[in-house]
Design a protein with these regions (language model features):
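Surface-exposed loop/interface segments of Gram-negative outer-membrane beta-barrel transport/assembly proteins
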Residues: 1-65, 102, 106-204, 221-330
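Outer-membrane beta-barrel initiation region
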Residues: 74-76, 86-90
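Periplasmic N-terminal accessory/gating domains of Gram-negative outer-membrane beta-barrel systems
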Residues: 67-73, 77
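A beta-strand signature from Gram-negative outer-membrane beta-barrel systems
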Residues: 1, 79-81, 94
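N-terminal hydrophobic signal/anchor transmembrane helix of membrane proteins
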Residues: 211, 217, 226-228
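Residue-level signature of outer-membrane beta-barrel architecture
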Residues: 88-90, 126-127, 209-213, 277-279
């Protein structure tokens, strides 16, 4: 099928240009000529299966039969979901604890999109006295996600495969280096350096009480809640090495060589305190009254730091970048 792709590309390009122009490249990453197309046909007829040759200048010439989506996706993947709960009650004390872990090993064959989620909930109450009950409800979650990215100009992996994942261009050169077409697309994932790592944590807790007085006619209730939400991201972008000539290495998107760290924190607190009184007088008159107080506050803080000039392609700490830094701080309440 590889030679048919090259022929169809030529026919489509030639027709689009009113049969007056021949292509010089397949988009930007593979050279094209009528001589190359004829050579491709000849190699097919002669049963030559080598996908890469080297011309007199040392440049690689490709006659590939590559399936870029086969290289992009795994044949199989694995996900796991575990749940556990414990409950108990002895009359004065009751509790419920549950936990969940979900893990997904990702869909991509290289630099895969791992996802992990952990949830924990614990709630309970205790009847301290006949007139006083205390309750607590805690919820915690932690999420980790790795999102691989492309530094090629197209942005997404699917767009870049559409633009540059030519079946006639293999992914690897004979020396194991990436081809130009691969570097623009799935080769970025194979290199495995570019991506966004996200970690989100949420901790919420509510503590409350209920008190009864005057033969259960007066009730006082109160609670205090806090919720801390932490959102963190680390993005790394580095150039992708590839080769078009034997023994020579160049870099795609050399302008990208940076690390960005983003941290956002939201702190929320709320408290409620109210009392109600109800009574029936003389079997004919009913009275009920309520008074209460509420307070809420939310504070948001964010820090954004980006710095270029990474010492190593796999640096994970902003301190391992020696270039220019951009810092942004935000605070709202």
């Amino acid at each position: 099928k590889r030679q048919e792709y090259a022929s169809h590309f030529y026919e489509a390009y030639h027709a689009w240009n009113n049969y007056s122009a021949d292509p010089k490249n397949i988009n930007k990453t593979q050279e094209f000529s009528l001589g190359w197309l004829e050579d491709f046909k000849r190699r097919k007829e002669q049963g030559i299966t080598d996908e890469v040759t080297v011309d007199a200048t040392g440049k690689y010439v490709y006659y590939g039969n590559e399936d870029y989506y086969d290289a992009l996706y795994k044949k199989t993947t694995f996900a796991q979901d575990h749940n556990l709960s414990v409950t108990g009650n002895n009359g004065k004390l009751n509790y419920y604890v549950s936990g969940r872990f979900y893990g997904y090993d990702g869909l991509f064959r290289y630099n895969t999109d791992n996802y992990k989620m952990m949830n924990l909930r614990a709630k309970g109450s205790v009847q301290v006295f006949d007139w006083l009950k205390i309750e607590n409800n805690m919820d915690f979650s932690n999420m980790d996600y790795h999102n691989p990215i492309n530094v090629g100009e197209g942005g997404s992996i699917w767009r870049n495969i559409s633009d540059e994942g030519h079946p006639t261009s293999p992914i690897f050169n004979p020396d194991g280096s990436l081809t130009f077409s691969a570097a623009y697309s799935v080769g970025d994932f194979i290199y495995g350096k570019n991506g966004i790592d996200t970690n989100n944590k949420v901790l919420k807790n509510t503590t409350g009480f209920t008190a009864s007085f005057l033969e259960n006619k007066l009730h006082v209730r109160g609670d205090f809640t806090f919720r801390n939400t932490d959102e963190g991201q680390t993005q790394r972008r580095v150039p992708v090495p590839y080769s078009t000539h034997e023994g020579q290495t160049v870099e795609l998107s050399a302008k990208y060589n940076d690390l960005k760290e983003s941290n956002m924190r939201t702190e929320y607190i709320a408290t409620n305190l109210y009392a109600d009184y109800e009574d029936t007088f003389g079997d004919a008159h009913y009275f009920k009254g309520m008074v209460g107080y509420n307070y809420e506050q939310s504070t948001y803080k964010s820090t954004y730091v980006q710095r270029n000039g990474l010492l190593l392609d796999d640096s994970e700490n902003i301190n391992l970048a020696l270039g220019d830094a951009i810092t942004c701080l935000l605070y709202t309440s």
